[in-house]
């Protein structure tokens, strides 16, 4: 037997074994030749959205969407708000704004038409990873004669105006989205090549960014994601979200290759795999509403897919009391259906008994507090002025305390921060021939003395060195006698002054006591009755729930009292009415779970802590989890992860409560033992192509020759693109000898 015939013999033995194994239905169901992947397509038009047929930069532009997916509706978030998306220069752009971008992936009446489709992914039997599936088309027009191009469409959009490079009318302008989930096993990849915009999110993170219209020449419009580089956790379920738009003539290309095992956790009521209910518009809901009620969309899985959701909307009446505070009560506005502050609620009414003092309310300041109308700061010395409110004008009026002239025998003046200084009017006219007295009504009186003798020359009575102790001539005998008058009285009836008489001038001196202020925000004052110093603190605003502060430069400022007790499980508030506790109140904090997938409890140090719920599971080979989109517990098959997922797959056994790992059969050539590779005797590269290339195809090739293989290829709708994929046509695949080529061409 020649060398070629020996190789062929060993190969046919191996091939027969493969054919027998592939007849096993369990293996075929594990890795079917085809998978239908559900997608949603929105037909758009340059007439409804100017982002389509926009100037073509013919290059990928990154950063058109944000790195994080909008988890509320699993849609990409436009990068730039109301601004244009950037392009290669300032004068051109590829997206107008967030409003035009919105209709790419959201239902919008008269702007887009929603079409449900599925893409058939085919297992790549020539790959060294049996999990690889691909979808490829160089004429990707999945909604030709649909949407705006459908015969039944009678709207304003012009039909059949966009043609491909061969002149055939095509439905060029659409956006596609695919939502699924997967259990990360290890070794998965996702590759794409095509036009135009493509974004891929895994675990809500952007992992492939191919934005803007572009062609597929060279490396343009292609990229790959290796999931092992994403920091994913094996056996954990992750969301997968794929977005694709065809925005520009004249070609449409798509090539997707992936080993990710897509699953659909649920279908929403719109019939979309892992959809977020985008078909729902609450304004279209059917039913009656209370005065302040409004409609909300149903829960994603509350009704069966494609059931008319308009009859199943939720009626929601807002509980406005949840927004109430001490100062603000809320009520529902029937027009806006929103909670708004009540204009009738006056919590501080009657709290003030003066029109010069306003009763105000501020929750940060503890509720009701009193605020004075503006005062004259030049008259704020209460030792000199008494303030009163003019209730008619609601203004402060001031009366000087030391300007009382009802007693003309008493002289009064105000000493700042010490009060009134009162002294007896000095009625001495220095005339010994008068009797000096004082009337409180008229003041000083000087009555002449009859038969008064003038002072003789040389009388020394007026030459006293102490002018506070006055001497004057005896009006009846002025020769030698002097009359000693009473020492001058300098008592001003104010305990805050030191009263003395200046002997040289004879004037009274009433010197204020020195009182020192404690800080720059205080004024030192003396009590005119006791003579004791008092400190008047200007920063006391009289509000229990504020902390009165004084800055270094003497400016008063006020901080809300936090009443912090150091316990994160209490709600600490301050109310001015709680005088017994200094205003502070500490009520228990109620921790609400953020959704039905969580429970919540309070930790004194951390506050409210969210804990995922444990969903019940009925068997070892099932796992359960709470889905963040539906907020419900779901069940899935337990993933069994082999050491090398490209060579083995895992099967869960409920009886043994263990995962069983089996080799793929036929085993990919890269996974074969050295003995098998030697027995086949084919170069490693060629054998890889032959062994994994599909046992059915190889069987036809081996036993039916070229014609049998070509007939099978034709029956598969040209899924194999070139004749060179037939091993009978390739003498040296990957630099190795092909025994089938030699045997069929000898």
Curated annotation (Swiss-Prot):
The chain crosses the membrane at residues 680-700. Residues 701-746 are cytoplasmic. Residues 714-746 are annotated as: Disordered. Residues 125-276 form the PA14 domain. This is Protein psiN. GO terms for cellular component: extracellular region; membrane. It comes from Dictyostelium discoideum. The keyword Ubl conjugation does not apply. Keywords: Glycoprotein, Membrane, Signal, Transmembrane, Transmembrane helix. Coiled coil: none annotated. It is found in: Membrane. Residues 24-679 are extracellular. It comes from the Eukaryota. Residues 717-746 have a biased composition (Polar residues). PANTHER family: PROTEIN PSIB-RELATED-RELATED (PTHR31137), PROTEIN PSIN (PTHR31137:SF3). Residues 1-23 form the signal peptide. Belongs to the prespore-cell-inducing factor family. It is a single-pass type I membrane protein. The keyword Phosphoprotein does not apply. The gene is psiN. Glycans are attached at residues 97, 124, 319, 353, 380, 477, 553, 628, 654.
């Amino acid at each position: 037997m020649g060398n070629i015939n020996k190789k062929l013999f060993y190969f046919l033995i191996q091939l027969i074994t493969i054919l027998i194994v592939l007849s096993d239905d369990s293996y075929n169901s594990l890795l079917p030749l085809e998978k239908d992947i559900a997608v949603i397509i929105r037909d758009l038009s340059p007439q409804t959205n100017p982002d389509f047929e926009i100037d073509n930069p013919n290059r990928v532009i990154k950063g058109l969407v944000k790195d994080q997916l909008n988890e509320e509706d699993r849609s990409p978030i436009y990068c730039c708000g109301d601004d244009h998306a950037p392009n290669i220069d300032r004068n051109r752009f590829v997206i107008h704004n967030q409003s035009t971008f919105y209709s790419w992936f959201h239902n919008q009446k008269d702007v887009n038409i929603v079409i449900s489709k599925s893409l058939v992914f085919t297992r790549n039997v020539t790959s060294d990873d049996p999990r690889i599936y691909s979808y490829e088309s160089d004429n990707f027009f999945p909604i030709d004669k649909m949407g705006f191009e459908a015969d039944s469409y009678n709207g304003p959009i012009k039909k059949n105006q966009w043609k491909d490079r061969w002149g055939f009318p095509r439905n060029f302008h659409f956006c596609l989205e695919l939502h699924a989930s997967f259990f990360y096993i290890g070794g998965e990849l996702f590759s794409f090549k095509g036009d135009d915009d493509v974004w891929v999110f895994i675990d809500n993170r952007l992992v492939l960014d191919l934005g803007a219209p572009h062609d597929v020449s060279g490396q343009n419009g292609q990229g790959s994601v290796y999931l092992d580089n994403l920091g994913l956790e094996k056996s954990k379920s992750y969301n997968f979200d794929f977005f694709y738009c065809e925005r520009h003539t004249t070609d449409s290309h798509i090539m997707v290759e992936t080993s990710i095992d897509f699953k659909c956790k649920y279908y929403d009521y719109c019939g979309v795999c892992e959809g977020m209910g985008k078909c729902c518009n609450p304004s279209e809901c059917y039913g009656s509403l209370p005065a302040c009620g409004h409609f909300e969309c149903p829960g994603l899985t509350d009704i069966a897919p494609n059931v008319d959701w308009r009859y199943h909307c939720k009626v929601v009446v807002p509980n406005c009391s949840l927004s109430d505070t001490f100062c603000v009560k809320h009520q529902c506005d029937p027009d806006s259906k929103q909670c708004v502050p009540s204009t009738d609620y006056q919590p501080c009414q009657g709290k003030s008994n003066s029109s010069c003092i306003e009763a105000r309310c501020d929750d940060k300041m503890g509720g009701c507090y009193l605020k004075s109308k503006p005062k004259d700061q030049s008259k704020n010395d209460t030792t000199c002025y008494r303030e009163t409110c003019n209730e008619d004008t609601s203004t402060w009026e001031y009366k000087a305390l030391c300007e009382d002239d009802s007693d003309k025998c008493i002289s009064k003046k105000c000493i700042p921060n010490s009060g009134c200084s009162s002294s007896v009017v000095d009625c001495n006219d220095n005339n010994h021939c008068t009797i000096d007295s004082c009337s409180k009504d008229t003041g000083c009186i000087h009555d002449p003395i009859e038969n008064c003798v003038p002072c003789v020359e040389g009388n020394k009575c007026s030459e006293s060195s102490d002018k506070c102790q006055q001497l004057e001539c005896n009006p009846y005998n002025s020769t030698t006698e002097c009359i000693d008058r009473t020492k001058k009285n300098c008592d001003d009836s104010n305990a805050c002054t030191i009263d003395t008489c200046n002997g040289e001038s004879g004037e009274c001196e009433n010197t204020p006591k020195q009182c020192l202020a404690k800080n720059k925000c205080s004024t030192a004052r003396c009590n005119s009755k006791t003579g004791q110093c008092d400190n008047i603190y200007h920063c006391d605003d009289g509000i229990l729930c504020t902390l009165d502060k004084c800055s270094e430069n003497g400016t008063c400022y006020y901080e809300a009292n936090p009443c912090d007790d150091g316990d994160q499980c209490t709600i600490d508030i301050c109310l001015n009415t709680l005088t017994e506790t200094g205003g502070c109140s500490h009520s228990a904090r109620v921790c609400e779970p953020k959704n039905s997938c969580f429970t919540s409890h309070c930790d004194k140090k951390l506050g409210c802590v969210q804990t995922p719920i444990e969903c019940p599971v009925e068997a070892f080979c099932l796992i359960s989890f709470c889905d963040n989109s539906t907020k419900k517990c779901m069940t899935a098959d337990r993933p069994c992860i082999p050491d090398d997922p490209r060579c083995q797959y895992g099967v869960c056994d409920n009886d043994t409560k263990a995962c069983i790992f089996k080799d793929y059969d036929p085993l990919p050539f890269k996974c074969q033992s050295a003995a098998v590779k030697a027995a086949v005797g084919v170069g490693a590269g060629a054998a890889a192509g032959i062994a994994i290339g599909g046992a059915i195809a190889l069987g036809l090739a081996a036993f039916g020759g070229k014609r049998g293989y070509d007939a099978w290829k034709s029956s598969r709708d040209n899924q194999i693109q070139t004749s060179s994929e037939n091993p009978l046509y390739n003498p040296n695949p990957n630099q190795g000898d092909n025994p089938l080529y030699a045997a069929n061409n000898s």
